[in-house]
């Protein structure tokens, strides 16, 4: 959901 999670994974 969060953009930061997408950047990390």
From Swiss-Prot:
Record PTM Phenylalanine amide, positions in chain: 9
Keyword Oxidoreductase: no
Keyword Cytoplasm: no
Keyword entries, A-Z: Amidation, Neuropeptide, Secreted
GO CC field: extracellular region
Main subcellular localisation: secreted
Alphabetical GO biological process terms: neuropeptide signaling pathway
Record localization: Secreted
Family per similarity comment: Belongs to the FARP (FMRFamide related peptide) family.
Protein name per Swiss-Prot or TrEMBL: FMRFamide-like neuropeptide FLP5
């Amino acid at each position: 959901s969060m953009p930061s999670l997408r950047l990390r994974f």
